[in-house]
UniProtKB/Swiss-Prot annotation:
One of its GO terms (molecular function) is metal ion binding. The keyword Transmembrane does not apply. This is Mannose-specific lectin CEA. Disulfide bonds join 54-74, 173-195. InterPro entries: Bulb-type_lectin_dom, Bulb-type_lectin_dom_sf. The lineage of its organism: Eukaryota, Viridiplantae, Streptophyta, Embryophyta, Tracheophyta. One of its GO terms (biological process) is response to other organism. The keyword Phosphoprotein does not apply. A motif (Carbohydrate-binding motif 1) lies at residues 51-59. A motif (Carbohydrate-binding motif 2) lies at residues 170-178.
Length: 264
C-alpha cells in the first residue's frame, strides 16, 4: 500500500492518495486511443461506459452525453487536441466535448472524486525503455495505484503501479521507476532524509526533504492548473495538463437512456 505524508501546513496539504485506492481496470484514455462499444474506464466506484445504445455514461458520477439511440456501433476517441469525440459506426460525429487546445498528447482520466477530466498536453515523460545514467535493474515491488494528481504526495516507499511497472518514492530519497528494459531513477540516493514527492499545480514533480529543501525537480513547470502523473501500462510515467475539460454532475431527472438501471 502507498504510504502518504499528511501535512498540517495548508501550503502543501493538497489531495492525498488514499491508502486503499487501487485502480480497477484501465482508468485513462490517451490521445489516439478508442473506447469501443461496451468499453469501460473505471476508478473505484466510478465507471465510464461507452454503451451499446451510443450513450456515454459515467455511473455514480451523475453524467452522460445524452446520445442514447443516436447511433450504432459508437466509439469514443480522444483527439490530439484534447477533444473527446463519439463517432457513429459510419464515421459520423454524434457528440464532442468541444474543448480543444493546442496539438499534443492528452489523457482523459476517471478522477477518484467521480469526474471525467481531460488533461494535457503532456509536459514531462520518464522513459524506462532507453539506456542512460538513470538506468537500473528491475526488482519486484508490491502493487498499488497508478495516478498522482496535483497536490498529492508520496513518501517513504509510497508508490504508483501499473502492471509490472512501479514508480517508488524510496525512503533513501531516490525516486525510482522499476520496469521497462532499463528502468529509471532520479539519482538522489542519500541526498536527504524523510523525502517526499509532490506534483504541483504547474505540472512539476518535486522531491523535497524534511527541511523542505528541493532535492530534485522534473523542471517541467508550465501554466497554473490541475495536472496528473500517469504511470501507464506501457511503463512510461507521463505528466499531463493542465485540465481543459471535465464532466459536471447532472440532475437526476436528466439522467435518461440508461441501459443499466439502479447504478447511479
Amino acid at each position: 500500500m502507498a504510504k502518504l505524508l499528511l501535512f498540517l501546513l495548508p501550503a502543501i496539504l493538497g489531495l492525498l492518495v488514499p491508502r486503499s485506492a487501487v485502480a480497477l481496470g484501465t482508468n485513462y484514455l490517451l490521445s489516439g486511443q478508442t473506447l469501443d462499444r461496451e468499453g469501460h474506464l473505471k476508478n473505484g466506484d466510478f465507471d465510464l461506459v461507452m454503451q451499446d445504445d451510443c450513450n456515454l455514461v459515467l455511473y455514480n458520477g451523475n453524467w452522460q452525453s445524452n446520445t442514447a439511440n443516436k447511433g450504432r456501433d459508437c466509439k469514443l476517441t480522444l483527439t490530439d487536441y484534447g477533444e473527446l469525440v463519439i463517432k457513429n459506426g459510419d464515421g459520423s460525429t454524434v457528440w464532442r466535448s468541444r474543448a480543444q487546445s493546442v496539438k499534443g498528447n492528452y489523457a482523459a482520466v476517471v478522477h477518484p472524486d467521480g469526474r471525467l477530466v481531460v488533461f494535457g498536453p503532456s509536459v514531462f515523460k520518464i522513459d524506462p525503455w532507453v539506456p542512460g545514467l538513470n538506468s537500473l535493474r528491475f526488482r519486484n515491488i508490491p502493487f498499488t495505484n497508478n495516478l498522482l494528481f496535483s497536490g498529492q504526495v508520496l513518501y517513504g516507499d509510497g508508490r504508483l503501479t501499473a502492471k509490472s511497472h512501479q514508480l517508488v518514492m524510496q525512503g533513501d530519497c531516490n525516486l525510482v521507476l522499476y520496469g521497462g528494459k532499463y528502468g529509471w531513477q532520479s539519482n538522489t540516493h542519500g541526498n536527504g532524509e524523510h523525502c517526499f514527492l509532490r506534483l504541483n499545480h504547474k505540472g512539476e514533480l518535486i522531491i523535497k526533504d524534511d527541511d523542505f529543501k528541493t532535492i530534485w525537480s522534473s523542471s517541467s513547470s508550465s501554466k497554473h492548473g490541475d495536472y496528473v502523473l500517469i504511470l501507464r501500462d506501457d511503463g512510461f510515467a507521463v505528466i499531463y495538463g493542465p485540465a481543459i475539460w471535465e464532466t459536471s454532475p447532472q440532475a437526476k431527472e436528466k439522467m435518461i437512456g440508461m441501459v443499466t438501471a439502479g447504478k447511479l
